[in-house]
């Protein structure tokens, strides 16, 4: 993998995940929301529930499944960004959850990737700061 491929892999993973979620009936509200150093890859509605979605993409599972990379520290960062998004949004106080999409993708030509597997972990974790 050349030096640009990890970034490309992540970007393509987010594109693959957004399409996958839309096919499952999610409505994408925003992508790559940033609050200070914290980022949420995808914010989507699943019915009336706001879903804050972390996308983890790997080229193989040799270093573990992609979703295993969402550490407690990463969960805290996502939760902080989610709180900021909710404070700025007009959604009121909706039901919320944290989902993870894990993708194994293989490189194609032209900086594109093809998903070998896509797995959704709905309600994958809870806000670690809220006990």
From Swiss-Prot:
Pfam families: UPF0102. GO terms for molecular function: nucleic acid binding. It comes from the Bacteria. CDD domains: PoNe_Nuclease (cd20736). SUPFAM superfamilies: Restriction endonuclease-like. Transmembrane segments: none annotated. Gene3D superfamilies: 3.40.1350.10. HAMAP family: UPF0102. Belongs to the UPF0102 family. This is UPF0102 protein Cvib_0014. It comes from Chlorobium phaeovibrioides (strain DSM 265 / 1930).
């Amino acid at each position: 993998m050349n030096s640009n491929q990890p970034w490309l892999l992540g970007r393509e993973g987010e594109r693959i995940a957004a399409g996958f979620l839309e096919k499952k009936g999610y409505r994408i509200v925003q992508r790559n929301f940033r609050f200070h150093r914290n980022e949420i890859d995808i914010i989507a509605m699943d019915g009336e529930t706001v879903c804050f979605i972390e996308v983890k993409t790997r080229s193989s599972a040799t270093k573990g499944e992609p979703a295993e990379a969402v550490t407690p520290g990463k969960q805290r960062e996502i939760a902080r960004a989610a709180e900021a998004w909710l404070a700025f949004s007009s959604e009121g106080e909706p039901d919320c959850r944290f989902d993870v999409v894990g993708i194994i993708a293989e490189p194609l030509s032209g900086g594109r990737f093809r998903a070998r597997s896509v797995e959704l972990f709905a309600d994958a974790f809870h806000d670690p700061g809220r006990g």
